[in-house]
Each structure stands twice: as structure tokens, then as C-alpha cells.
A protein has these predicted regions:
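Single transmembrane alpha-helix segments in multi-pass membrane proteins
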Residues: 30-96, 121-128, 262, 266-276, ...
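Transmembrane helix-bundle core of multi-pass membrane transporters
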Residues: 130-193, 220-223, 242-251, 295, ...
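Transmembrane alpha-helical segments in multi-pass inner-membrane proteins
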Residues: 232, 242-308
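Helix-loop-helix "hairpin" substructures at the membrane interface of multi-pass membrane proteins
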Residues: 99-108, 112-119, 123, 170-247
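Cytosolic-side transmembrane-helix boundaries in multi-pass membrane proteins
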Residues: 1-30, 34, 212-219, 293-352
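Hydrophobic alpha-helical transmembrane segments
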Residues: 22-27, 52, 60, 81-82, ...
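Structural signal for alpha-helical transmembrane segments and their membrane-water exit/capping regions
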Residues: 28-45, 72, 145-153, 188-195, ...
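Short loop segments and helix-boundary regions at transmembrane helix junctions
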Residues: 13-18, 70-75, 94-96, 113-155, ...
Length: 352
């Protein structure tokens, strides 16, 4: 006589373990709302949320691009150069004419995609170090922006139609937020329901095995940098509309923020696993945290300290670390159940 071994459904366990790596960012968002409602209620007012939505979404769109690169096991430090290039091209190509907005958008996206292609070929094709390559390409882009900036007036604004549209509200929220939400949804659908998306994740998680089964790892890396650069361009164009007169250093604040959002969002820095939704949520959280600290009147020095500690804390409780903790819990539970079942079986056999 035997007793069936009790096991949790493997699919349910796997789903819970994977989902747990993304849980901390949502808990952090809830905690931020609670803290703000107590010590900085003005941050949650209509004016405060109107400030968080567009700039948080800007960081989110940029973080989505960085996420794609990190999923391939790389990193992209050319973000400020690419983003600034797109913003300045909106000014230079449009020449303050609403009729040239479309041409300016296509030009900015095209040039940015070219920057991403250069990154992808050097890293995916020639196997150069991603950190060094993207840093160098970003510097080249910033140099080109400075040179191009001399050909247009320093005080030239973007077309009125563009700045007006970016500053409008759709269902009470900035259109930049809706753009970020749509891009996030598209990536979720791609990863879950398309062959290309599933292969992209598989290649990032295990490039060696992917090569063995015939997947084109190099092409995967190149595509990641190109799509990421297009997302940076979208963020740069939106930033130009918000600033109205973008400068040659407009993209500099977006060097480390997107990386922090990806990390806090639970992505695996070794490649493969990442969630577009948690990455976008992490970006909203980071900008919201900055906004709340400003409303609370914290000194700038203390804001830097808090921001840094939050990033470190996010790395400690999200991603691979929390996965190991959850797996350890399930392992101990399975072990205790196995011992219990063996004990029951032994007692039954003994009485038989």
C-alpha cells in the first residue's frame, strides 16, 4: 500500500517563481503612494500627477529600450547621445514649421536607428565590449549633436503644433504616458504571443544553446540595439516637445535612470528574463520618488542619498536574488513533504 506523493503543479510553481521577481516594484509603488499621502499629499494632487505622468513615461520609454539590450546580456550607454540627437533633429529639420513635423519625426527615428545599427554590428557582429562600444558611440553622437547645433539658432523652439500636442491631455493624462503604455503593451504581446518574441527571450537567456539549435544570436543582438535606439528617439522627440527649446545636453539625465529602472523592475542582468510592465512601473516609481522628495523639501544632497539607497535596495530584493529566495522556500517545502510522505509510507508498510 502506498501514498501518492504530494506535489505542487510545476507550471503553477514556475509561474509564481517568475512572477515573484517582479513583485517588489509594485510593492514599492504602493509604499510610495502611502508615504506621499502622509508627508507630501500635494504630490498626489492633479498638478503633481500631471508632472509625474509625462516625465515618468519618458523614463519608462527609455527604460524599455535599455531592457531589450539588457535582455541580450548587453548594456547601452549611448542613450543620452541618441535621445539628444532626436530632440535636436526635431528643431533643425522642422524649422519651426508644423508642416515639417512628420519629416522631422521620420528623420529623428531614422538617424537613431542608424546609431543603434552601428552599436549592434560592433557588438553583435564584431563581438566588441558593449560597455565600451556604446559609451564611444554615444560620445560620437553627442559630438555630432554639438556640431549640428551650431547650424541652427540656440533659441530655436520646436514647432508650436508639436509642443501643443505633447502638452495636451488625453483622458486627463499626458499623451506621452499613453504612448509609453501602448509600447509596453506591444512588447508584452510580442514576448507572450509571438514566435519572434519568445525566441528573443530564449536567445538572451541561453545564447550558447540557441546557437546549437540554429537561432541567429548575432542578428538578435543587432535587432535589440536598433529597436532600443528607436525607443530612445521616441523619448527624445517627446522631450523636445516638453522642453520646447531642447539643448545639446538635454539627454544627459537619462544615462543611469533607465538602467536603474530595468534593475528595479526585476530584469536579469545576465540576459533573458525581463518584464516590460514592471520596467515601465519602475520608471514611474523612480520619477515619482524624485517628485515626492522635492515636494517634501528634502535637500538635494539627501535626495541623492535616498535615491541611491533605493536603487541598492531594489537590487537586493528584486530580480535574481528574490528568485533564489522563493526557490529555496519551495525546495524546503518539497523536501519536508517528501520526508513526511516517506514517513507515512514506512509506517503503513510496517503495520502491513
Amino acid at each position: 500500500m502506498s501514498v501518492a506523493t504530494i506535489r505542487a503543479p510545476s507550471s503553477a510553481v514556475t509561474s509564481f517563481v517568475v512572477a515573484s521577481r517582479y513583485m517588489p516594484v509594485y510593492l514599492a509603488l504602493i509604499l510610495l503612494v502611502i508615504v506621499a499621502s502622509i508627508w507630501a499629499p500635494a504630490a498626489l494632487g492633479s498638478v503633481g500627477l500631471s508632472a509625474i505622468a509625462p516625465y515618468g513615461a519618458l523614463l519608462g520609454i527609455t527604460a524599455l529600450g535599455q531592457m531589450l539590450v539588457i535582455m541580450t546580456g548587453g548594456i547601452d550607454l549611448s542613450v543620452p547621445g541618441t535621445l539628444t540627437m532626436a530632440a535636436v533633429l526635431m528643431v533643425g529639420v522642422s524649422q519651426q514649421s508644423d508642416g515639417r513635423i512628420g519629416v522631422a519625426i521620420l528623420t529623428a527615428i531614422g538617424v537613431s536607428a542608424l546609431i543603434g545599427l552601428v552599436n549592434g554590428i560592433l557588438i553583435g557582429g564584431l563581438k566588441l565590449n558593449a560597455l565600451i562600444v556604446t559609451l564611444a558611440v554615444g560620445q560620437v553622437a553627442l559630438g555630432a549633436v554639438n556640431r549640428y547645433g551650431r547650424t541652427i539658432s540656440v533659441q530655436s523652439p520646436v514647432p508650436t503644433g508639436w509642443s501643443t500636442w505633447v502638452s495636451t491631455r488625453i483622458f486627463g493624462v499626458s499623451p506621452i504616458f499613453w504612448i509609453g503604455a501602448v509600447l509596453t503593451l506591444l512588447l508584452i504581446v510580442a514576448f507572450r504571443y509571438t514566435t519572434v518574441g519568445r525566441r528573443f527571450q530564449a536567445v538572451g537567456a541561453n545564447p550558447v544553446a540557441s546557437r546549437v539549435v540554429g537561432l541567429r544570436v548575432n542578428l538578435n543582438q543587432i535587432a535589440a540595439y536598433v529597436v532600443a535606439a528607436v525607443l530612445y528617439a521616441i523619448a527624445g522627440l517627446a522631450l523636445a516637445g516638453l522642453l520646447r527649446i531642447p539643448g545639446v545636453n538635454s539627454g544627459m539625465p537619462y544615462l543611469l535612470g533607465p538602467i536603474a529602472a530595468v534593475v528595479i523592475g526585476g530584469a536579469s542582468l545576465t540576459g533573458g528574463l525581463a518584464s516590460p510592465l514592471s520596467t515601465f512601473a519602475a520608471a514611474i516609481f523612480l520619477y515619482g520618488l524624485n517628485h515626492v522628495m522635492r515636494v517634501m523639501g528634502l535637500p538635494t544632497s539627501l535626495q541623492f542619498v535616498v535615491f541611491g539607497l533605493v536603487i541598492i535596495g531594489g537590487m537586493l530584493v528584486s530580480g535574481d536574488r528574490i528568485i533564489k529566495v522563493v526557490e529555496r522556500v519551495f525546495r524546503e517545502r518539497r523536501r519536508s513533504r517528501r520526508i513526511e510522505n516517506e514517513t507515512i509510507e514506512s509506517s503503513i508498510d510496517g503495520t502491513g
